[in-house]
């Protein structure tokens, strides 16, 4: 209940209450403790101080001779937090919120408001009328989050103290005055409701501060303080310091949820409702305590809950079972504050004069259901726990040293029963271990029961580092199977002990145990299996000692027989008794083995080595925790001794005095800023005004994207398309016409400026069309948002845009997304950083649910995004191509990426000065200082030493050469480079030196000290010292800004650098601070990365590698030794990447030439999406893609980018141009390359004016020993950084797992981490949707500084281009073949009437030859007067064995009136394309329609599928079941907007791609649209077009061509016309008044245009709707006299041509208005596959019918490569081999009954294809002979473009061409009917040797036709001239006979 205070209970009343409480708990049905003690009042009387007044139930077991008691003074239980001071929170470090359960969904969480959203602040409630129930009072509560406000609460008076601080009932009862909710019985519940957001456990004493009263004006105001205790009589401990942060007595650790500053979530114990407590959990750890001992507890083994913070005396018994599998260490230190407050995880030492017990008792027990403690209480300590023998192996004895045996405590739900404590299991930690011996021992948990620890617990650290390695028996069968093991391969305890010894023995003196390394040892041992008989418990001691003997004394074995506590106690006692001289002989590790009589061995490891114990303890702290610890040490002055040490130089002189002396000596003179030696001084005023010449030659300002970036961008685009095509309907690309974006970056000002600069340089805002050219530069910053406190406002605005623009595809790019992945529920202010913001933004419901929003997370260390709970699908990951595989073919001059792997491999180069270095001299200094200052964190010591090293190096190089020998050579070399290089150049360019100092306080200290030393030494104009803090802008002195401006030729005096790249060439030291590097790019002048502060605190892969990632860059290929490149070439064939093919394509191009920007439209035609290098789509104007200056006056960008830098479009720095010794030529340009080889730098590289380019060398990284060991090659025997835990926010999902395979690509690594890691509780993905990742989220991963920003900006660009392409369509753009010029003079002018005159049209001559370009390779039709181009002969021939010729297309933008395919979706026409649920398919009705076809000579049955909504277009029988007819309007109907003609669309194979959605084309008007489909395709069309009427052809037409569909449409339409005439005639309508027209339209008609005369004499073309076109034609006067009306085909040349006649008589196709009445006797050839329209038009014309084309209208046809009436795949009927064999055209026919391979294709199709390609063999005399065409009776067949056909109809009274005087070269009789007679044929003249070809259905018909037509009289036949199509008999082949004219 947590409401106790300074008053004390009488012991008798307390015991009675305790008894009642336990009894109530035991009797209750639930396992939770019941709220009791409300009958007790606290009495503040001074306690008597006698131990006898405390009556513990176990005192009898502890009572012995009083002389053996050790009396210890205990401090007051009233900790600092109980003081009345309002500001009683810790001032040295920001508090962590007291972690409660998450608030209910949808509730208000704003400070000052209750969860119902009502304002509780006193300033708002002061004048409100508040109803206060009887017995309640208004009080004011203070919230740590808003200290300036008081919250108004109503509390029951009974639970408030009186004026004396007495008589307050324990517990709580309160009401919310905001929303009126009543009955809060627990203060925890109430504090949650009013959003107190506490940093400690909720206590009414701490947070209810004031009574509230009304003033004279009646306003509510603050009254008197609530007197919770009698402050006058309460003594305070002298050792209690208010400046101390919360104690470290926590079981929290990184492995138990306490990472990155997240303290474990303690179970609610105070004022908490029982329902919130975990039954059977460790919440009972704060049960009744007796004499300072905590009872043993059993912790549940599930390991998913974080452990609570433990009180003073700790039993770690349950710890071994309660930790998570890979639990990290537990840090124990003396608790000086409330045990439930947040631990700082620092090292707390006992103050002078404190006894061990006083340290242990300073806090007292938790204040709930416990006996009160008093500062004067004397507590006895059992004598049996004190005398411990020295460290030595214990020999076998008759029994345990202590008579009491181990007892496992019984845990009672919620309340732990008081039990006697076994004295033998108690370990007293000696005093002052850390102070006296410089060691804080670390206890590595093994197996077994650990003892109670009592005394100076702050000097012992309990770590579960290796405990997961011993949990092999907990593996399930599935995990064992994945490891290739079975249960019988698990190791015994004895084997694990021996393996532990072997591992510890081989560790170096500067190595610490690594869990991942030891886990692999254990796994290998299991896989290898036992090599001999198992080790018995009796053999274990001597085998263990033998194993330890090889360690040289670093490992010792201690064997006990009672308990592990004996061995631990003995080891600690021995340590405390060791003299300082003997400390060097202490072992580093003591393995304690307990061999009990039961035969079960227990063991643990005590780490006593000074380095090892310290490194292990520090590695347990998360980054936030150790930064907080450093802050504490700096604030409290613990570093004063260390600081005083460094006030002197290494020679013993006072450093400050020495610097002052040097300053006075030089007076006002300073070292010359540049172009001068360090010994050359000038006056300071002159130095301040020295401006260098303009920098080295400027590079061109072109912006380029390089092949790897383009490859990645395309991969991202492909993945987006895959999401859209996945069928999950999570992304519909067809609805978007724009792209917008927002980039989220970590809270770094420099990173924001850097990203904004990339956006400006890339021109992406202009390319996306979201900003004007004039405003794009100024508005770029709107698209980049820092994840800080202002992100919510900007995200709200962004999400409003997302909701308001549903047809814009938004992309939310989360750059460097691995930096903060803390859950918003556990996010907190830690070390000044607000965490959880990314989770609130990226994972908020609005973002997850927005269907027009893509989330792209970008990371160079994506491991934490790839756990089992990842929100990103593995398919949605895009990984950077492997750089090694792209380097084999590149030129030595090219720049190649040099990354983390390359740094590790560089150690094999064998060079004298490696680029990856460890400063051994510095490490030796650090080791000495660490031993002198054991209380301080090692980073503090390293930082102070580093500052001194740089200071002394500056002094040694200028004024004190004697200090040279005291500075490490590495430091001296870096500083010498920094100082000397500017002096060698007239420009003053120099190096950048990057020093990484994670702690902000230490970084500021370093900046101050180095600036002070620099200025006093006169170097303030030589180099700059900058603090690189994420929270601040770059601050640079004025004279350095002037130097940068001079280099850039920048005239803007207000310009200052905003990014680190802007510091290009500036000699400077950048002290980079902050918890993590945030992705900032550094200039190529960065030469050194000093990472010597990155040590054993960075033991996760991400933490370590992101630090070394600062050094990664692009380097010149030739500077890399051949070992690297040779390896690359060897590995290249083995591992192929998707972009490897781009290398050879450009190998021969010159390396020094710039590639011109490519034309965007050309790129669109080739790649369909993007330009290659000229990334800006503005390059379609053939302009360079360089960005222009909006002011028109700058050379570079307005940011004054460096003249010698690469123009960068990505997150990579321009590679360092500085080599180890080559910067003496500072004016030379950096290496650049415009080669398009596959491996390109991520920067845009431009060719400099000079050709002698400086080589770009890798940067030098100087590491600590710990980091160097992990990054060195594994040949050194150490694990690599890749084997570490990938990130602190995830944990291993299994104690054992296979090792991380070497050389894994990004995808394989992702799969590994997804299988073997799981998110921790505070991770944003902790409750992620494992089975269903977010469908619209992608991950882009790539190495640091490789160019990811440029890649995703290019992705945005090509995504937009693709969306535009989706709104564009490729239409055929072909000019008509030459028309008959002689007729053009006779046509009316273009300004003629809108509609044709029937008589005028009759006067026009029908143009027999088809002019559409799709008939380019068809036979020309002979006419009386041939066009000029056709009077000659066509020479082209279509080779059917080759691919069909590509027709010209052009991309046009879809208009509002376009027809669409099934992928189109919009709100207006969704009923056209969106599939309906299966349950609604029954809404469609099936109807059979039967009629008799005179052409077929039999009845035909068609099937209609009619949706319910379309039934109004049909007439059904009275019963409603029989379809009678389709309704037709009347010719006289004048209703506006009415469409009279039903539209038939024959379609096949295009259920998705056919343009069957004509809703927009018809302007949404009512119309009748019928799809004519084959029977086997009906289900597919029904699925995609459920609301369309389907006309299903009979099954006999499944293999027929389009001619059959057109034939059936016309036959059905005429039969329906007759039915409608009969039906309407009964209603009094004349038969001739029924509308006789139908529309027959192809499924590829997309747009319609109308031509109008333009002002300049040219015609203007505008888009119109299909509705307007049809209505115009339907309104034609005397329309019933026209047989067919149609449109012309569009081409781009129409607008430029001179106006022609408005109407023509010619061939019509694609879209026709057909009069089925007039054309009753003119049929489509149902057998035809091709040219059926030409054949029909010739028949209709020969019948004397009118065909009229409206030339003012044109139709655009989309190029659809899929489906349609395309060629069949001709293949052999029986395939003997799998590989398809191409069949040549001559094999389409064969001799009857031959053995030739028969083909699986329709006979008619084979015939048409044969005639098309082989007619030159059939009719050799007609070849290229237009004067002697081939005579074709009643049919038009395509005989190829070289053979001309003369069409003649055999029908009586037909209109035929005048053939008088024409001698024909051949005769073609195709399925001729009875109208063809011998007398007709005798009218025609043929050349001698002319060819006859007679084609019939079968052989008998063929012979009968020969006889009937008397062909043998004039034609000679041979038996071998008979052929058939190459079909088998069941496929009904066609037969034909050829003959020669006699």
UniProtKB/Swiss-Prot annotation:
GO annotation terms (biological process): kidney development; morphogenesis of an epithelium; pronephros development
Record-level GO cellular component terms: membrane
Compartments (UniProt record): Membrane
Location of the region described as Disordered in the Swiss-Prot/TrEMBL record: 76-101, 235-306, 325-373, 1123-1256
Residue spans of biased composition, Acidic residues class: 81-90
Compositional bias of kind Low complexity: 237-253, 1158-1171, 1212-1248
Domain of life from the UniProt record: Eukaryota
Pfam families recorded: cpSF2-GREB1, GREB1_2nd, GREB1_C, GREB1_N, TAGT
Basic and acidic residues composition bias: residue spans: 1127-1155
Record's compositionally biased regions (Polar residues): 338-362, 1172-1202
Main localization (coarse): membrane
UniProt function note: Plays a major role in early metanephros development.
Protein name in the entry: GREB1-like protein
Organismal lineage: Eukaryota, Metazoa, Chordata, Craniata, Vertebrata
């Amino acid at each position: 209940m947590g409401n106790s205070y300074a008053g004390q209970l009488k012991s008798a009343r307390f015991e009675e209450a305790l008894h009642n409480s336990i009894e109530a708990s035991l009797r209750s049905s639930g396992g939770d403790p019941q709220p009791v003690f409300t009958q007790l009042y606290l009495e503040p009387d001074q306690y008597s101080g006698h131990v006898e007044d405390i009556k513990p139930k176990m005192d009898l077991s502890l009572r012995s001779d009083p002389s053996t008691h050790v009396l210890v003074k205990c401090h007051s239980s009233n900790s600092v937090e109980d003081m009345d001071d309002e500001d009683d929170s810790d001032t040295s470090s920001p508090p962590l919120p007291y972690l409660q359960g998450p608030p209910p969904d949808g509730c208000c969480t704003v400070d000052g408001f209750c969860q119902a959203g009502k304002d509780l602040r006193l300033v708002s409630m002061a004048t409100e009328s508040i109803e206060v129930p009887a017995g309640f009072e208004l009080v004011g509560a203070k919230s740590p989050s808003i200290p300036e406000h008081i919250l108004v609460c109503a509390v029951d008076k009974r639970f408030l103290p009186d004026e004396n601080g007495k008589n307050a009932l324990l517990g709580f009862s309160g009401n919310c005055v905001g929303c009126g909710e009543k009955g809060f019985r627990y203060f925890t519940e109430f504090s949650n409701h009013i959003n107190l957001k506490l940093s400690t456990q909720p206590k009414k004493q701490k947070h209810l501060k004031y009574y509230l009263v009304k003033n004279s004006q009646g306003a509510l105001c603050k009254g008197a303080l609530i007197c919770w205790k009698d402050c006058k009589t309460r003594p305070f401990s002298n050792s209690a310091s208010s400046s101390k942060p919360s104690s470290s007595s926590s079981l929290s650790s990184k492995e138990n949820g306490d990472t990155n500053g997240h303290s474990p979530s303690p179970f609610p114990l105070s004022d908490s409702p029982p329902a919130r407590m975990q039954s059977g959990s460790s919440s009972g750890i704060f049960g009744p305590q007796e004499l300072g001992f905590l009872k043993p507890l059993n912790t549940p083994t599930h390991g998913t809950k974080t452990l609570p913070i433990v009180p003073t005396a700790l039993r770690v018994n349950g710890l071994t079972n309660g930790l998570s599998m890979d639990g990290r260490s537990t840090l124990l230190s003396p608790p000086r504050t409330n045990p439930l407050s947040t631990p700082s995880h620092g090292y707390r030492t006992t103050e002078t004069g404190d006894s061990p017990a006083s340290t242990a008792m300073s806090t007292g027990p938790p204040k709930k259901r416990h006996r009160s403690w008093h500062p004067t209480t004397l507590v006895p300590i059992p004598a049996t726990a004190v005398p411990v023998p020295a460290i030595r192996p214990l020999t076998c004895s008759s029994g345990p040293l202590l008579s009491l045996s181990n007892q496992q405590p019984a845990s009672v739900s919620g309340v732990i029963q008081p039990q006697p404590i076994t004295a033998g299991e108690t370990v007293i930690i000696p005093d002052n271990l850390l102070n006296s011996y410089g060691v804080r021992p670390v206890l590595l948990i093994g197996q077994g029961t650990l003892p109670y620890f009592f005394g100076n617990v702050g000097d012992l650290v309990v770590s579960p580092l290796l405990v997961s390695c011993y949990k092999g028996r907990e593996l399930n069968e599935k995990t064992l199977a994945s490891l290739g093991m079975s249960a019988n391969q698990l190791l015994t305890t004895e084997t694990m002990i021996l393996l532990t010894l072997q591992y510890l023995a081989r560790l170096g003196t500067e190595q610490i145990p690594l869990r991942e390394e030891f886990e692999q040892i254990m796994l290998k041992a299991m896989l290898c299996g036992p090599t001999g008989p198992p080790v018995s418990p009796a053999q274990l001691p001597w085998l263990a000692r033998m194993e330890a003997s090889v360690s040289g004394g670093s490992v010792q074995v201690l064997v006990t027989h009672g308990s592990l506590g004996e061995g631990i106690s003995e080891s600690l006692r021995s340590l405390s008794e060791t003299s300082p001289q003997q400390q060097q002989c202490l072992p580093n590790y003591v393995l304690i083995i307990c061999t009990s009589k039961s035969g079960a061995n227990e063991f643990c490891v005590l780490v006593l080595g000074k380095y090892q114990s310290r490194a292990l303890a520090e590695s347990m702290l998360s980054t936030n925790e150790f930064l907080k610890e450093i802050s504490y040490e700096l604030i409290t002055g613990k570093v004063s001794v260390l600081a005083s040490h460094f006030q002197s130089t290494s020679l013993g002189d006072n450093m400050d005095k020495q610097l002052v002396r040097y300053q006075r000596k030089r007076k006002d003179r300073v070292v010359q800023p540049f172009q001068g030696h360090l010994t050359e001084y000038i006056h300071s005023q002159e130095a301040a005004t020295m401006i260098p010449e303009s920098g080295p030659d400027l590079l061109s300002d072109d912006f380029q994207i390089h092949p790897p970036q383009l490859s990645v961008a395309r991969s991202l685009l492909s993945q987006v398309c895959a999401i859209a095509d996945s069928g999950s309907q999570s992304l519909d690309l067809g609805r978007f016409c724009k792209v917008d974006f927002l980039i989220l970056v970590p809270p770094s000002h420099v990173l924001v400026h850097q990203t904004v600069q990339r956006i400006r340089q890339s021109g992406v805002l202009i390319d996306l069309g979201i900003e004007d050219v004039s405003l794009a530069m100024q508005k770029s910053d709107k698209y980049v948002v820092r994840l800080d406190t202002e992100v919510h406002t900007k995200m709200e605005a962004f999400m409003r845009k997302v909701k308001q623009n549903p047809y814009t595809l938004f992309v939310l790019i989360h750059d460097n997304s691995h930096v903060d992945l803390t859950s918003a529920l556990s996010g907190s202010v830690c070390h000044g950083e607000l965490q959880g913001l990314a989770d609130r933004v990226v994972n908020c419901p609005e973002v997850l649910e927005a269907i027009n929003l893509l989330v792209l997370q970008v990371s160079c260390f994506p491991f934490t995004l790839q756990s089992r709970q990842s929100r990103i699908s593995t398919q949605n990951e895009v990984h950077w191509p492997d750089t090694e595989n792209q380097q084999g073919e590149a030129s030595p001059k090219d720049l190649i990426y040099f990354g983390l792997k390359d740094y590790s491999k560089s150690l094999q180069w064998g060079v004298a000065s490696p680029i990856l270095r460890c400063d051994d001299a510095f490490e030796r200094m650090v080791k000495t200082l660490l031993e002198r200052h054991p209380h301080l964190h090692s980073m503090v010591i390293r930082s102070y030493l580093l500052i001194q090293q740089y200071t002394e190096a500056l002094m040694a190089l200028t004024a004190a050469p004697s200090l040279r020998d005291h500075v490490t050579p590495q430091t001296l070399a870096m500083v010498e480079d920094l100082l000397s290089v500017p002096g060698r150049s007239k420009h003053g360019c120099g190096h950048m030196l990057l020093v990484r100092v994670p702690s902000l306080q230490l970084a500021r200290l370093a900046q101050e000290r180095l600036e002070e030393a620099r200025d006093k030494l006169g170097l303030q104009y030589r180099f700059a010292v900058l603090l690189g803090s994420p929270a601040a802008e770059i601050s640079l002195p004025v004279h350095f800004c002037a130097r940068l401006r001079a280099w850039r030729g920048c005239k803007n005096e207000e310009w200052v650098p905003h990014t680190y790249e802007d510091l290009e060439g500036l000699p400077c030291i950048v002290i980079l601070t902050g918890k993590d590097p945030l992705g900032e790019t550094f200039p190529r002048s960065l030469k050194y990365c000093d990472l010597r502060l990155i040590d054993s605190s960075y033991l996760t892969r991400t933490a370590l590698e992101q630090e070394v990632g600062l050094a990664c860059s692009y380097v010149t290929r030739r500077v890399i030794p051949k070992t690297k490149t040779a390896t690359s070439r060897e590995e290249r064939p083995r591992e192929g990447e998707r972009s490897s093919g781009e290398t050879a394509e450009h190998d021969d191009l010159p390396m020094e030439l710039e590639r011109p920007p490519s034309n965007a439209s050309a790129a669109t035609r080739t790649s369909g999406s993007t330009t290659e290098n000229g990334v800006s789509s503005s390059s379609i104007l053939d302009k360079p893609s360089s960005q222009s200056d909006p002011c028109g006056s700058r050379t570079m960008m307005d940011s004054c980018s460096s003249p010698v830098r690469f123009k960068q479009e990505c997150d990579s720095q321009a590679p360092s141009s500085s080599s180890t010794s080559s910067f003496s030529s500072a004016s030379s340009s950096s290496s650049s390359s415009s080669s398009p080889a596959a491996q390109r730098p991520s920067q845009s590289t431009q060719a400099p004016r000079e050709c002698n380019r400086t080589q770009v060398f890798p940067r030098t990284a100087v590491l600590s020993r710990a980091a160097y060991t992990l990054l060195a090659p594994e040949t050194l025997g150490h694990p690599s950084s890749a084997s570490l835990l990938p990130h602190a926010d995830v944990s291993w999902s299994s104690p054992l797992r296979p090792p991380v395979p070497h050389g894994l690509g990004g995808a394989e690594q992702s799969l590994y981490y997804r299988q073997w890691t799981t998110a921790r509780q505070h991770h944003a993905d902790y409750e992620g949707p494992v089975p269903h990742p977010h469908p619209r989220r992608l991950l882009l991963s790539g190495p640091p500084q490789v160019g990811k920003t440029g890649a995703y900006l290019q992705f945005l660009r090509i995504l937009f281009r693709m969306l535009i392409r989706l709104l564009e369509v490729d239409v055929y753009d072909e000019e008509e073949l030459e028309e008959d010029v002689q007729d053009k003079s006779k046509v009316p002018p273009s300004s003629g009437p809108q509609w044709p005159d029937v008589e005028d049209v009759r006067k026009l001559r029908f143009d027999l030859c088809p002019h559409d370009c799709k008939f380019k390779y068809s036979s020309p039709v002979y006419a009386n007067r041939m066009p000029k181009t056709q009077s000659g002969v066509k020479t082209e021939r279509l080779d059917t064995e080759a691919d069909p010729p590509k027709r010209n297309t052009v991309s046009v933008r879809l208009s509002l009136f376009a027809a669409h395919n099934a992928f189109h979706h919009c709100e207006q026409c969704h009923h056209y394309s969106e599939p309906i649920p299966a349950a609604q398919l029954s809404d469609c009705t099936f109807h059979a329609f039967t009629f008799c076809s005179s052409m077929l000579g039999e009845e035909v049955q068609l099937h209609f599928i009619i949706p319910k909504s379309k039934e109004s277009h049909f007439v059904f029988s009275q019963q409603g079941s029989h379809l009678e007819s389709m309704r037709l309007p009347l010719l006289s109907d004048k209703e506006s907007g009415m469409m009279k003609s039903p539209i038939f669309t024959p379609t096949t194979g295009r259920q998705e791609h056919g343009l069957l959605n004509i809703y927009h084309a018809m302007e949404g008007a009512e119309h009748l649209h019928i799809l004519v489909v084959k029977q086997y395709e009906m289900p597919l069309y029904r699925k995609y077009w459920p609301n369309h009427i389907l006309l299903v052809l009979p099954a006999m037409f499944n293999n027929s061509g389009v001619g059959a569909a057109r034939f059936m449409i016309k036959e059905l339409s005429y039969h329906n016309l007759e039915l409608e005439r009969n039906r309407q005639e009964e209603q009094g309508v004349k038969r001739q008044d029924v509308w006789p027209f139908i529309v027959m339209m192809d499924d590829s008609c997309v747009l319609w245009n109308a031509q109008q005369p333009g002002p300049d004499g040219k015609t203007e073309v505008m888009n119109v709707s299909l509705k307007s076109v049809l209505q115009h034609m339907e309104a034609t006067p005397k329309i019933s006299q026209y047989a067919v009306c149609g449109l012309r085909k569009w081409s781009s040349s129409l607008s430029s041509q001179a106006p022609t006649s408005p109407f023509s008589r010619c061939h019509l196709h694609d879209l026709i208005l057909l009069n089925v009445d007039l054309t009753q006797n003119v049929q489509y050839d149902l057998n035809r596959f091709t040219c059926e329209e030409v054949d029909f038009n010739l028949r209709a014309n020969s019948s004397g019918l009118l065909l009229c084309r409206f030339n003012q209208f044109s139709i655009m046809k989309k190029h659809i490569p899929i489906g349609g009436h395309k060629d069949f795949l001709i293949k052999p009927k029986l395939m003997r081999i799998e590989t398809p064999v191409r069949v040549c055209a001559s094999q389409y026919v064969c001799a009857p009954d031959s053995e030739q391979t028969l083909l699986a294709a329709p006979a008619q199709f084979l015939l048409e294809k044969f005639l098309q390609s082989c007619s030159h063999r059939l009719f050799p005399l007609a070849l290229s002979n237009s004067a002697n065409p081939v005579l074709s009776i009643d049919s038009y067949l395509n005989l190829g473009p070289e053979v001309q056909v003369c069409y003649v109809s055999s029908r009586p009274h037909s209109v035929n061409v005048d053939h008088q005087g024409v001698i024909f070269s051949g005769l073609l009789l195709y399925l001729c009917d009875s109208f063809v007679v011998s007398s007709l044929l005798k009218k025609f003249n043929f050349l001698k040797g002319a060819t006859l070809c007679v084609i019939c259905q079968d052989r008998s018909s063929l012979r009968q036709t020969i006889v009937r037509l008397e062909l043998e009289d004039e034609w000679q036949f041979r038996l071998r001239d008979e052929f058939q199509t190459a079909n088998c008999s069941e496929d009904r082949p066609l037969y034909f006979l050829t003959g020669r004219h006699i």
